[in-house]
């Protein structure tokens, strides 16, 4: 009170040592620092377990909270393609519920733990089957080449009361398929769950190629199991390799697919590259799945998998009408408000600038007219297949899968510096007033709840490429009608892919310096780059009040696809419906062929690319280097789009792009493509090794670039005498090896090069002899970069996870985000519970860099399709021959 005297005192003479308090309270409330989310994992049922319809399934979880208590554990189940349905809640340990009267079906079960501070964590899903006592078969589908045999296994779902005989009987339209062993199998109460083998042989009746038969395994008192077997043409041993790998990829027990049938980026969960978690997926992964199924259709005549892959893509990655509300409000005269890109993540959020002129969108009207919808038909690039982050579907928290995004802060933002966010941002997570949006821009002064999707154009083009080969194979079999509907969707996707051919803000194409000085484009004639840029994106208000679209400005050589451009320009079965789609792709084809001639080094490797917006801000922050050469006014960039690591140092971008060139050359015989390949192929073989005898299989670990190309001239292209590439180190990347083999195979088949054919065969033989395992193909990888799990932000180097001072937010599991949360691991604490985390922890503690054997979906598919491509183009050549 005023006028009252107070005396304070302290023991300033104390000389002891104070220990840090472990807990303290304020007015009785415990203070523990930033709340740590709980941990949770399902302990019952077991993955793959089978139950009887109508029974009660016991669902249990182990849950704990390091800095508090577990308030509750909620359990959910979903069917493939369905949403999560609550099945019970437990508030005390042991966390167990009884799921009563479960109907027959396939289910995915998860547990969601909530702690005393409201933080949540979602467990990994567990897939179970509910059926009566049944005969279990694996795999459910099998392809057997003529003159060869294949196998499947049989077991029982539960113990019989006495010895039980399982009989296997064939039915269907293909008498050429027969059981040669395992027609009768005996199971006892002791060995009921030990798989026994059935062998199926295919005859040699040419009329039965593509035929199918169903082999039904039955036993008294048990439901039957059935395996569909397709008779494949006899080609070479390489197609046997293809079918073996296809079976491994499609075997649910091997973990390539989620319980909902979504292909994972990798079988393994602890993997950090473009996706920051192995059980995310990408449009790239889906494109490889479609390619895999196209080749499977060629070998077997079965097109079910091809159509199913596209249906899954459309269901999970292409936003539905409800997921992109208000696209009818889009104003093509004002596609988007300008926001500059910055050199470093710590220069964000960037300020939007409505005063910068933007061009008009020339595609919107004709696409809406052609397809009767204002919606964009394109896949988002990244999907959290298991809802690991917990955003759910449009922030409902539990829906799976969940559309997310990561990279948004300029060329120096590596995966280690990303802040994952939901594509549908309703401010439920992140910052309470802006969600995650205020990490990236200032919102023009305010923020609106919104959705935003980013497309990866190279994946879309690969989908078109795969669809073309499916069309060719199915037509040769007289089965084109089986995939007509899917081909129409691929053509539609290719039509929308044209959004990648422009400057980001539809500005003038070429010589575009100064965000204000560079004029807005007014038509295709002055704003179309004609090259596949790194992305395009679209979004809008959650309430549908406004919407926007942008392109990408920067073209990387590794994203170009002349094969897809040629297909969309010329193939009647994949022709876009829009009036100018085919012509646009014809123009792009010519531009891409010129682009590669411009970027080819003296040695043969293809240099980085070019941009219409230097630095992502039209040179406002820093102009292009003096004398920087140009391609139709686009500025040369040796590391386009991202710099950590340099974007064109990976040899895989060489093989990916040149494989498409080789397909295009094989299909058309275009001399322009041949000239580029004639120089690239000898260089690629000179920097790679493949020796089946020793198991040596290497490609360059890193490519370094010096000099620059000559400024492009259509009438007199330069020789690029000053542009050079140096290959250093070696790497055994099995996926890149498969891509290289495929490139050389197409080139050899058209050019007659025996050295290219031999090298391709050596790659394939070495892969199969030395790098196969139970899941597919892999090689040991040392991951020294995993030291960056705990790399803190440094204002000196600009590296490490940057969160602006004063910015705070939370993830669905309660993990707090702030400038103090400045490591990759701090916002992904669940990584410490990964089965392989101990390898990383040992490294962080001073041990050796961890070694992993990864099974990436794209890599397995690249290998599988390389086997089939060689079998198709050199059918009389067998392994080792």
Task: Please report, for each region that a protein language model flagged, where it lies by residue.
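Extracellular low-complexity, O-glycosylation-prone Ser/Thr/Pro/Gly-rich "stalks"
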Residues: 1-33, 790-846, 851-881
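Long, low-complexity serine/threonine/glycine- and acidic-rich segments characteristic of extracellular
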Residues: 1, 31-132
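Extracellular recognition modules
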Residues: 9, 108-114, 199-201, 216-218
């Amino acid at each position: 009170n005023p006028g009252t005297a107070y005396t304070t005192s302290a023991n300033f003479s104390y000389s002891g040592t104070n220990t840090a308090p472990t807990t303290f309270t304020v007015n009785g409330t415990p203070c523990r620092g930033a709340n740590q989310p709980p941990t949770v994992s399902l302990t019952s049922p077991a993955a793959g377990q089978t139950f009887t319809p109508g029974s009660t399934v016991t669902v249990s979880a182990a849950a704990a909270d390091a800095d508090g208590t577990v308030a509750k554990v909620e359990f959910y189940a979903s069917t493939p393609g369905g949403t999560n349905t609550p099945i019970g809640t437990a508030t005390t340990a042991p966390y167990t519920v009884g799921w009563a009267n479960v109907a027959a079906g396939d289910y995915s079960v998860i547990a969601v733990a909530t702690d005393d501070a409201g933080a949540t964590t979602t467990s990994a899903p567990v897939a179970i089957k509910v059926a009566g006592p049944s005969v279990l078969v694996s795999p459910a589908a099998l392809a057997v080449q003529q003159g060869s045999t294949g196998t499947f296994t049989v077991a029982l779902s539960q113990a019989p009361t006495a010895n039980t005989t399982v009989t296997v009987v064939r039915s269907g339209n293909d008498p050429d398929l027969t059981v040669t062993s395992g027609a009768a199998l005996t199971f006892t109460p002791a060995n009921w769950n030990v798989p026994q083998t059935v062998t199926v042989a295919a005859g040699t009746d040419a009329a039965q190629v593509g035929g199918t038969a169903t082999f039904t395994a039955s036993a008294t008192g048990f439901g039957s199991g059935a395996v569909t077997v397709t008779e494949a043409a006899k080609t070479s041993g390489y197609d046997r390799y293809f079918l073996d790998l296809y079976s491994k990829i499609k075997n649910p027990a091997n973990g390539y697919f989620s319980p909902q049938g979504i292909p994972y980026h990798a079988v393994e969960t602890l993997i950090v590259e473009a996706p920051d978690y192995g059980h995310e997926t990408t449009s790239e992964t889906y494109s490889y799945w479609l390619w895999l199924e196209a080749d499977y259709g060629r070998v077997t005549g079965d097109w079910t998998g091809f159509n199913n892959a596209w249906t899954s893509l459309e269901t999970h990655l292409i936003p539905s009408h409800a997921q992109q509300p208000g696209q009818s409000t889009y104003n093509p005269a004002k596609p988007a408000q300008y926001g500059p890109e910055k050199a470093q993540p710590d220069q964000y959020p960037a300020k939007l600038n409505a005063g910068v002129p933007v061009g008009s969108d020339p595609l919107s009207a004709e696409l809406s007219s052609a397809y009767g919808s204002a919606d964009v038909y394109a896949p988002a690039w990244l999907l959290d297949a298991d809802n690991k982050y917990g955003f759910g579907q449009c922030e409902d928290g539990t829906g799976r899968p969940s559309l997310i995004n990561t990279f948004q802060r300029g060329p120096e933002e590596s995966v280690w510096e990303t802040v994952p966010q939901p594509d549908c941002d309703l401010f439920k997570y992140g910052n309470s007033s802006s969600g995650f949006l205020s990490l990236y821009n200032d919102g023009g002064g305010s923020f609106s709840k919104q959705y935003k999707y980013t497309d990866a154009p190279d994946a879309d083009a690969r989908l078109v490429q795969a669809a073309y080969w499916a069309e060719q194979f199915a037509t040769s079999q007289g089965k084109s009608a089986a995939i007509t509907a899917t081909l129409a969707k691929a053509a539609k996707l290719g039509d929308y892919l044209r959004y990648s051919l422009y400057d980001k803000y539809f500005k003038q194409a070429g010589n575009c310096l100064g965000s204000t000085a560079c004029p807005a484009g007014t038509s295709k004639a002055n704003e179309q780059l004609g090259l596949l840029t790194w992305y395009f994106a679209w979004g809008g208000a959650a309430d549908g009040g406004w919407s926007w679209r942008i392109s990408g400005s920067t073209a990387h050589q590794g994203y170009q696809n002349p094969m897809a451009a040629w297909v969309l320009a010329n193939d009647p079965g994949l022709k876009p419906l829009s009036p100018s789609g085919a012509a646009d792709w014809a123009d792009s084809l010519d531009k891409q062929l010129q682009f590669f001639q411009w970027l080819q080094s003296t040695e043969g490797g293809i240099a980085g690319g070019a941009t219409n917006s230097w630095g992502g801000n039209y040179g406002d922050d820093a102009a292009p280097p003096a004398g920087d050469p140009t391609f139709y006014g686009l500025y040369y960039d040796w590391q386009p789009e991202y710099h950590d690591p340099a974007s064109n140092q990976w040899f895989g971008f060489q093989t990916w792009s040149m494989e498409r060139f080789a397909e295009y050359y094989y299909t058309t015989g275009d001399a322009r493509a041949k000239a580029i390949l004639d120089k690239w192929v000898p260089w690629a073989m000179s920097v790679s090794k493949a020796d089946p005898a020793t198991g040596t299989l290497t490609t360059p670990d890193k490519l370094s670039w010096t000099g620059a190309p000559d400024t492009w001239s259509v009438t007199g292209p330069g020789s690029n005498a000053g542009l050079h590439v140096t290959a250093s180190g070696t790497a055994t990347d099995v996926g890149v090896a498969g891509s290289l083999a495929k490139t050389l195979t197409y080139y050899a088949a058209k050019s007659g090069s025996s050295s290219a054919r031999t090298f391709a065969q050596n790659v394939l033989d070495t892969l199969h002899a030395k790098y196969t395992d139970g899941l597919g193909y892999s090689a040991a990888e040392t991951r020294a970069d995993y030291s960056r799990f705990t790399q803190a932000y440094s204002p000196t180097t600009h590296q490490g996870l940057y969160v602006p001072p004063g910015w705070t937010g939370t993830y669905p599991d309660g993990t707090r985000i702030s400038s103090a949360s400045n490591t990759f691991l701090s916002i992904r604490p669940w990584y410490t519970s990964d089965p392989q985390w101990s390898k990383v922890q040992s490294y962080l503690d001073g041990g050796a860099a961890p070694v992993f054997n990864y099974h990436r979906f794209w890599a397995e598919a690249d290998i599988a399709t390389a086997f089939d491509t060689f079998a198709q183009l050199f059918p009389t050549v067998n392994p080792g021959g």
